[in-house]
Amino acid sequence: MKYKRIVFKVGTSSITHSDGSLSRGKIQTITRQLAALHHAGHELVLVSSGAVAAGFGALGFKKRPVKIADKQASAAVGQGLLMEEYTANLSSDGIVSAQILLSRADFADKRRYQNAGGALSVLLQRRAVPIINENDTVSVEELKIGDNDTLSAQVAAMIQADLLVLLTDIDGLYTGNPNSNPDAVRLDKIEHINHEIIEMAGGSGSANGTGGMLTKIKAATIATESGVPVYICSSLKPDALAEAADNQADGSFFVPRAKGLRTQKQWLAFYSESRGGVYVDEGAEHALSEQGKSLLMSGIAGIEGHFSRMDTVTVYSKATKQPLGKGRVLFGSAAAEDLLKLRKAKGVFIHRDDWISITPEIRLLLTEF
């Protein structure tokens, strides 16, 4: 079995009718495939959108609401209805499902991040199928993960999945928008995600969901940097899930980084919030970027912001002002500044185990999305 632990993500358009309402037939198609894979021995996680779509009709809205409060109320009703559909279908095949609602704060806080990963691991060990969505009812708009493509990649990285499959209404990444450009060609295999790939993704999207092709490229970047391969393929094919699990999907395949980031490094790179900045001299820059060493106090050339011990900070080159990476500090900003002034700056400021260098792909995540 090439891919045992698989995360599938289905978007709103993959489980709804053209009017935006929930399609029980489409959900049954997905759960039928999940059940077959589960019984074949795969460990499965489903990240599913559709809570708003499932709930807005029950609240008397004629169409999908636009106002934030209306969407959150619809999600509150719809999440239960959505889970009811998934649970009924999976339980008829003898499969236990579990609901997990996550938010950006669950990833930003290291302890909550570890707890979520632990719960998911137990569910998979006990042969349950976790069904995950963002907690839309209570999430603050400015602090949301924002789309389930990104959420699915974060989950896949967290549990060290063998494969992430992003199911959509477009069968992969094209050189242009296939709906409007007859000359657009699908890319079947993507070795590296760069500016050109991001430009290609800018024109594709769907009317009902919030995650267009650009968010799928962001998700693919997070996953592949974490060592997880990614398929983007159409949910419209009756055996799309099985084909992806068998490495035969009709879509775009993203090749993972040869040595994926460990969980601690993932958290530093993608989720930890930087509380300040540190500028380092040329020697420290070389030690961090080229030799994989810890950052010593003696290499610090400047500090900005206010941060505490074990906070995450961004480290910059004094010469170029470009970010070199992120790390958790062993001294707060006040203590570090005092030591620097007294010329008693000795010891380790950021240990190499709590450091992540910014690769070109991670830089794209920080600057392009």
Curated annotation (Swiss-Prot):
GO terms for cellular component: cytosol. Substrate binds at S49, D136, N148. ATP binds at K9, T168, D169, T210, G211, G212, M213, L214, T215, K216. Pathway: Amino-acid biosynthesis; L-proline biosynthesis; L-glutamate 5-semialdehyde from L-glutamate: step 1/2. Keywords: Amino-acid biosynthesis, ATP-binding, Cytoplasm, Kinase, Nucleotide-binding, Proline biosynthesis, Transferase. GO terms for biological process: L-proline biosynthetic process. Signal peptide: none annotated. It is found in: Cytoplasm. Gene3D superfamilies: Acetylglutamate kinase-like, PUA domain. InterPro entries: AceGlu_kinase-like_sf, Asp/Glu/Uridylate_kinase, G5K_ProB, Glu/AcGlu_kinase, Glu_5kinase, Glu_5kinase/COase_Synthase, Glutamate_5-kinase_CS, PUA. GO terms for molecular function: ATP binding; glutamate 5-kinase activity; RNA binding. It comes from the Bacteria. SUPFAM superfamilies: Carbamate kinase-like, PUA domain-like. It is an enzyme of class 2 (transferase). It catalyses: L-glutamate + ATP = L-glutamyl 5-phosphate + ADP. NCBIfam families: proB. Catalyzes the transfer of a phosphate group to glutamate to form L-glutamate 5-phosphate. This is Glutamate 5-kinase.
